[in-house]
Each structure stands twice: as structure tokens, then as C-alpha cells.
Amino acid sequence: MDYEEILFGLQPILNASSIKDVPMNDVYLGSYLAVMDQLAVSLREPSNRDIVGKTGLLLNLVRVLEQALDICFHDTSISINDKIAFYEISSEVIRCIANAIIDNDDNREILLDSGGKKLLNYYIGGVLQLDEISSDKSEDSLVDKLQMRSVVLLRNFCIGNLKYTENLAPFIRGPLFVLLKTTQYSYLSSPEKVVLGSDLLNDILKVNYSNVQISDLFFLSQYIKKISSNVQNKELQAMEDGAVEAYSNTETQKFAGQGNQEYIEKEEEDDEEDVNCELLLNLSTCLETIVAKDETINFTNEEQLVLSMQKNLILSLVCLESKTFNNKLIVMRRLISCAGNISANLTNSNKREQSLCIETIKSSASSYALAAALMILCNSVASKSDAVALLKLISLSELIQVGSLLQDPLQYQGFLDLLRKLLNLENTMWLDIKDLFTLFQIMRRCHEQTKYYNNLRSLLTNLLNKTLTVLPSSKIHNSISSDPTIISFIAEHGTLTSCIAMDKLLVSKKALPKEAITSLWDSIFKFQNLGQAEQLSISDLFHITKTVGIYLKDSSVTADVNPIENILFKDYIQKLTLILETILSFKENKDKGSESCFNNGKFIAGIILNIVKNTKCLTPEEQNLEALAKSFF
């Protein structure tokens, strides 16, 4: 960089007490802009950034920029030509400052110490909200350039520094929303500005997500719907995150590297599809961040906006489902997360959305749209009366069949919890065997998905336990008889689930293969529930002792008539002994849980004594069990 030459060319601007005193005819203006362009290009070199910081040039540029923007914003006496000239100067100075602070903390500190906080918060924020320079909008390209470079300046200032981002966030978030709103219907005419602006908004929302207006949430959903319709069915290469360098009149910017490496100026054609995919990813992330993190959002009296938001999200999912595009899985999951978090808000009853969701379920084959609809419906059921009312609008059979279309693990969340809320003793009695078979198949497929997505485990376990609890024992027996793999699926779900299944099968008094019984006992005596490493609770011990008691009382299921043939004596006597020893220690406990377990243990002990009383030859383990049983009396 020929620093002296650049400094000489900028002397009229730098030495003037006010930039208003600087001649601004075309010749002079062209000269200033040319010198600043040279300076901006030279600041690609890190050593030149150090020079402008240490020599005070950066400090002077900040002063000039603040003066120029202050005149543009507040001086009503200047002509439109002078105003345009000052905006031209401001644009180039913004570009120079943006490039000077790339990967240079010293220059960032200079910017802050020289009054840069007001510059960034107020003046640059004002540029982002600039709608026009002249009433005939003849300077739209200048506005676009100013805003693009302002976004770059803010991004390069914040990148990699959480403290700076937190300080700027409250002042910049609003202007960024305004910037995006003005481009909603023309974003393809200024793609870099919109993509980088939405990316910066992502960073801002990570640290400042509270108190966003409901209307802004609706705007994001609208924008997402519009972009979704523009995404083409085409595989695209992902762009990487990075800082940016402000661009010149004839150059656009693309990523130069990875991580925190900066944009450099390159000549490259805009790729409309890259823009759509990048913007879709950024805006879906923005919306998800807000609705997932801000627990203070209040949708009271905003029912129509909420309905419109959910409709926009569902329509976006329907539109995107059949398309192949970059980051599709991430985007689709974020959109159903948005719908789910909006519906899960405690101030949202979700009643007005029921018709939308039912229509989606009955007419759409989009698995992600169906997943969103199921989540919303699930959150609309808060009581038994809600469940009854919903089942008047859509049948269990229809909901179960929808579940067979789900594939992505995240799609199952609403389905699992909704079915758990709706199933009861009455409606399962009339459940068609075909629907029941489908339900077990869905749950088994979902169980396989829990290997990759642990959050589904508790939801699936709750539904499986509810299903086994409310189904008639004959239907459970028939289902297992027609599909023996159901037993292995149940057994894999742990002690409590296996206890519930065993209780129902024992009540049915129909014979089952010994292999099925063994699978359930193996699971019960693992003393562990799916996804839980800790020891069983009092509640689990109660269920185990209840199941053991039922089995010993009526062991005709496998024709066990004496200790030699009884499977608990033959294969699980050590486990049975351990349980009774544990429960015997509850003898003096006064809490209801311990008392219930002890009563079950006493019942088991009585049956054991009855079984062994006529047996002449007991093994040492059976003798120990007999002595333990007597201790209960």
C-alpha cells in the first residue's frame, strides 16, 4: 500500500473541520471515491490494517463517517445532490472500516474508543432502516450498497467476539428485522445483503432472543413460505460460515475459507438457488431460536396470527417435502420444531388450529407437514374432555394410519404423545385388529429410531405402557400370537413395560410359547427400564412383585405345577430371592410405597410356602427361599 499517496488523496476530507466544507462536485467526489477504493482493496493485507490503526487513519475515518451520516440523517438544508454525495462517501468509508477490522481486535477497540458504539448502534442501524435517498427511488442501488456494507461492517465487528455481539444486539436486532422486511418481495435483487443480514440476525438472536414482536414471528413465517415456493428441486453445495469483506461496485463476495476466515472480494455470478437455500436455512434458524428459547412469549389475544403462522409453516413443509435441496433435513426439522414450540407455548390453546391440522392429515402425504400437524393437535389436548372432543373430529384409525407415513425420528414426537393422550379403555375395545397391528409396527419402527435419537425413548415408552394398560388382554394376546416379534419389542423396553404386558397375558389365561414368557421374565429381572441406568424405584418394585404374585398364583400358563417345573424356581430363583430380601427390609417402613411392596412380598411368600409344602426334596436355593418366605410371617 502506498500509504502516503492514499493519505494525500484523502487530505481534503480528513483535514476539514466539517465534511460539509469539502468540495463535492463530480471531479472531487470521483477522486475521493477512487482513493478510498484503493484503500479498501489494500486492506485485504493484514499488515495494512495494522498501519491504518496505528497511524490514526482509522480514527479519522470513523469521525468522517459519523459526520457524513449525521448530515444525511438530520441536515434538511442540503441539496439532494450533496446528500447523494455524502452517502457515496459514507458507503466507501464503511467499506474501508469494515475491511480494517477483519481479524484485528486492536482496530475493533479503536473503533469502539473513538465513539464507534454510537456509530454502530445509531448511525449504522439507521442505514439498515433506510428506505430511500430520493423520492423517485433513483438511488436504490446506492441504498443497497450502503446496507450491504453496513451489514458487513457489523458482522466483521461481531464475529468471534461474544462480548461485542451482546453489546450490539439490543440496538441492531430491530433494524435487521426492518432490513429483511423491506426485501421480502425483492430479495433476489440484492441476494448478498439479504443472506448476510439474515445470518447476522441469527448471531444476534443467539444472545438476544427475548421480547420479539409477535408480528415479527409472523413475518418470518411469511418469508419462509415465500422462499419455500422458490426453492428448486436441485442438489446444492452448502456454504460455510465466515466473516465478510465489504464489496466494491463491480465485485460480489463469496466465502474464502472455513471457520472464521473472512470473505474476500471476488467476481462471481449470483446463484439464485444458493440464495434461496441459504436464506431458508437462516430464517428457519431465526424463528426456531426465538420460539424455542423465549419462554415469555405471550400469544394471548393473538389467535389469528398464531393460526396464520402455523398455516405458513405447514404449507412450507408441504411445498419443500418433494424437493431436493441443500440442508433439507436441517431445514425440515427446524420448521417442525418451530411449529411444535409455538403450539407448546402455555398461552396457546391450539384450538383454532385443529381444523387446519385435521385437513392436513386427511389431505396431505407430506410426512413433515403431518408431523407438525400431529404436534399441534397433541398440544391442543389438555384434558379428558379435549380428547373426547378431538375424537369427534378425527378417528383413532385415521391418526394411526398417519403414523405409518412417518420416517424421520423427529416426526414421531407429536404422534406418540397424541396417541397416549387419546387411548382409553373404551376406544381401544373397538380398535380394529388391523389398526392395532399397524400401531405396534409403528412403535417398533420408532423403537429402532431411538438408537439414533434418544429423546424419543420416554415418549415411546409412555405410549407403549398406555397401550398395554388400556388394551383388552385378549387383543394383546391375539396381537402377539399373530406377530411374535411384538414380544421381543416389548421385552427390549425394560422391566416396567414387560410387567404390564405379563400381567395382561396372565389375565387372558391363554397359553403362550415358553420363549415368549422367558423373554418377558428376562426383561423384568434385568431390573432396568429403557434409557435409565439407575436402580429401580419403589414403584417399579411394586409392579415386579405384583406380576410375580399373579404368575405364582396361577402358573397354568406354562403348566408349572411344582418347583421343578415352575420357571421362576428353575431359572430365576436367585432374582426372586433378591427381590424378597429387598422387600423384607421394608418391614418397618411406614410410607405407602414400602407398605404396598411389603404386602405384595408377603403375598408371594405365602404362595411360595404353599408350592413347596408338599415337595419332599428341595434344593439348597429352594430351602433358602422357603426360609426367607417364612420370615414374612
Swiss-Prot record:
<dbReference type="GO" id="GO:1903338">
    <property type="term" value="P:regulation of cell wall organization or biogenesis"/>
</dbReference>
<keyword id="KW-0539">Nucleus</keyword>
<dbReference type="InterPro" id="IPR040144">
    <property type="entry name" value="RAP1GDS1"/>
</dbReference>
<dbReference type="GO" id="GO:0005634">
    <property type="term" value="C:nucleus"/>
</dbReference>
<comment type="subunit">
    <text>Interacts with CDC42; the interaction is direct. Interacts with RHO1; the interaction is direct. Interacts with RHO2. Interacts with RHO4. Interacts with CDC11.</text>
</comment>
<keyword id="KW-0589">Pheromone response</keyword>
<keyword id="KW-0344">Guanine-nucleotide releasing factor</keyword>
<dbReference type="GO" id="GO:0030010">
    <property type="term" value="P:establishment of cell polarity"/>
</dbReference>
<protein>
    <recommendedName>
        <fullName>GTPase-GDP dissociation stimulator BEM4</fullName>
    </recommendedName>
</protein>
<dbReference type="GO" id="GO:0005829">
    <property type="term" value="C:cytosol"/>
</dbReference>
<comment type="function">
    <text>Probably acts as a GEF (guanine nucleotide exchange factor) for the Rho family of small GTP-binding proteins (G proteins) that stimulates the dissociation of GDP to enable subsequent binding of GTP. May also chaperone the processing and/or trafficking of small GTPases independently of GEF activity. Involved in the control of polarized cell growth via CDC42-mediated signaling. Involved in the control of cell-wall organization via RHO1-mediated signaling. May also function via RHO2 and RHO4.</text>
</comment>
<keyword id="KW-0963">Cytoplasm</keyword>
<dbReference type="GO" id="GO:0019236">
    <property type="term" value="P:response to pheromone"/>
</dbReference>
<dbReference type="GO" id="GO:0007266">
    <property type="term" value="P:Rho protein signal transduction"/>
</dbReference>
<dbReference type="GO" id="GO:0005737">
    <property type="term" value="C:cytoplasm"/>
</dbReference>
<dbReference type="GO" id="GO:0005085">
    <property type="term" value="F:guanyl-nucleotide exchange factor activity"/>
</dbReference>
